[in-house]
């Protein structure tokens, strides 16, 4: 530990944050979120680099997404650009993993007696808590979609599956 409050490989992580910010700048005019495990706590340089590039961290206020050696913090973040901020209805961390006992950890399969008696559940399915993001996508003034053709009961009239995803305006 270098004693500077930064995690391992700080210069590399700052460079990665800069590269992400440069890439995401292409979408500045579109609502864009940067979401995931940034492997940096909120006061570390990589997070500060994203904030300096104009990204607002909209997650994690007082919430922990990760626990290591009994100490909690947040390595998982949600950042929004100015175009995305009006769409946010809420952001929170779902405390389903990090605070659970390591005895229940997903990677310990075969070593845990509890797996023989417990039903499948989301607890300790990762070592990080997921971020939950609420979005308001359609306002009250949005027009209702209109069908492009009359519905048919003939199964042959259905479009055939395609390997290419379709674009939705």
Predicted regions and their residues:
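Active-site His/acidic residue clusters
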Residues: 1-10
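Non-membrane alpha-helical structural segments and their capping/turn regions in soluble enzymes
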Residues: 10-18
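Metal-dependent phosphoester-hydrolase catalytic domains
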Residues: 14, 22-33, 38-147
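Ser/Thr/Gly/Pro-rich low-complexity, disordered linker/stalk segments of secreted
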Residues: 140-169
């Amino acid at each position: 530990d270098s004693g500077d409050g930064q995690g391992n490989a700080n210069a590399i992580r700052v460079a990665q944050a800069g590269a992400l910010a440069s890439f995401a700048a292409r979408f500045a005019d579109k609502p864009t979120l940067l979401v995931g495990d940034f492997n940096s706590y909120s006061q570390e340089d990589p997070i500060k680099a994203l904030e300096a590039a104009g990204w607002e961290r909209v997650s994690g206020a007082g919430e922990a997404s990760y626990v290591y050696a009994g100490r909690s913090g947040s390595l998982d973040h949600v950042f929004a650009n100015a175009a995305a901020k009006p769409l946010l209805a809420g952001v929170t961390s779902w405390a389903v993993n990090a605070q659970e006992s390591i005895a229940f950890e997903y990677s310990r399969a075969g070593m845990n007696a509890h797996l023989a008696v417990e039903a499948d559940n989301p607890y300790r399915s990762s070592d990080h808590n997921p971020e939950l993001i609420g979005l308001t996508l359609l306002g009250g003034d949005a027009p209702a979609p209109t069908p492009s053709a009359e519905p048919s009961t003939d199964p042959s009239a259905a479009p055939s599956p395609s390997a290419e995803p379709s674009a939705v305006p």
